[in-house]
């Protein structure tokens, strides 16, 4: 029978993760696990709190560390990811929400608050984090969300139920949006796949091995395929004066501006994220 590793200290835990993270990231991952799963304070962590975990806690810690040492993301190991002040269930088959996407939600809620925006569509919803956050932060809005993935929709629906968010979900391929659909929207928002295949070599191995490629990558020869399809759908489905919000690949920022202008959108804006990268676009029809 295989013997599980014994972990006696915080240092031993984070050093075990150095094949997948740099030192600072490894320490942050371990602190998140110890604080949120085992209830340790930072003082506990640095003062031998790991050694004082009881037998059942040690067994759970060993199981979690075995997954982390295989490169499984901490969010999958914990079963959730924080986003906009809430915990969203995540697991294999759904992209882990990124902190920068919170800015897209804030922007959408601001847009809803200053206009008559009521009907909102989130295309490529994944875990549902964008749609659910908007529904909860702007409770007068009516939010719908699409995704092509059955696994993603299952998780998104579970999140909406657990967070008491009134979101209507539908299985739909963003590349084949129903142009004959009579439904109209005030706001369409999307964070579609935008990482070019040639960028794979720059990405962390644990992301490549565990997160769904379907939600990440686009062909090098047509990296704007989702944006183009959604923009064309928006011309048909947005009400006059309606807004289109995207999270984008900063490497394609100028191409995105050109695409939206060529598709006859007005007031096209490019907005930087907290790190100064061109991460979002806004346009009206």
Language-model features and meaning:
Residues 78, 171-172, 272:
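Short loop/edge segments at beta-strand edges and connector loops
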Residues 194-226:
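Mobile active-site "lid"/loop adjacent to the S-adenosyl-L-methionine
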Residues 75, 195-198, 251:
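Active-site beta-alpha loop architecture of Rossmann-like, nucleotide-cofactor-dependent enzymes
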Residues 100-202, 229:
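Conserved SAM/SAH cofactor-binding pocket of Class I
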Residues 87, 142, 166-168, 266-269:
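Conserved beta-strand segments of alpha/beta enzyme cores
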Residues 34-110:
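Conserved AdoMet
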Residues 1-46, 53:
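Non-catalytic accessory regions of SAM-dependent methyltransferases
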Residues 220-283:
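Conserved Class I SAM-dependent methyltransferase catalytic core
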């Amino acid at each position: 029978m295989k013997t599980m590793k014994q972990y006696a200290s915080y240092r031993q835990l984070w050093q075990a993760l150095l094949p997948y993270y740099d030192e600072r990231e490894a320490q942050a991952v371990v602190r998140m696990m110890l604080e949120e799963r085992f209830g340790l304070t930072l003082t506990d962590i640095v003062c031998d709190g790991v050694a004082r975990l009881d037998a059942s806690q040690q067994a759970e810690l060993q199981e979690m560390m075995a997954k982390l040492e295989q490169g499984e993301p901490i969010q999958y190991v914990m079963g959730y990811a924080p986003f906009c002040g809430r915990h969203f269930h995540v697991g294999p088959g759904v992209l882990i929400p990124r902190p920068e996407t919170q800015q897209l939600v804030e922007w959408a809620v601001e847009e809803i608050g200053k206009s008559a925006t009521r009907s909102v569509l989130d295309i490529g919803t994944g875990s549902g984090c964008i749609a659910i956050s908007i529904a909860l932060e702007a409770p007068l809005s009516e939010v719908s969300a699409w995704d092509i993935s059955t696994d993603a929709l299952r998780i998104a629906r579970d999140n909406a139920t657990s967070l008491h968010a009134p979101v209507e979900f539908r299985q739909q391929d963003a590349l084949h949006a129903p142009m004959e659909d009579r439904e109209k929207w005030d706001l369409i928002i999307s964070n579609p796949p935008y990482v070019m295949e040639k960028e794979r070599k720059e990405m962390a191995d644990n992301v490549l091995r565990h997160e769904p490629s379907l939600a990440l990558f686009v062909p090098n020869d047509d990296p704007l395929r989702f944006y183009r399809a959604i923009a064309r759908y928006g011309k048909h489905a947005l009400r006059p004066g309606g807004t289109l919000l995207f999270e984008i690949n900063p490497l394609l920022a100028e191409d995105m501006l050109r695409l939206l202008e060529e598709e006859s959108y007005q007031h096209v804006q490019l907005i930087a994220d907290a790190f100064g990268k061109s991460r979002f676009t806004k346009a009206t029809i």
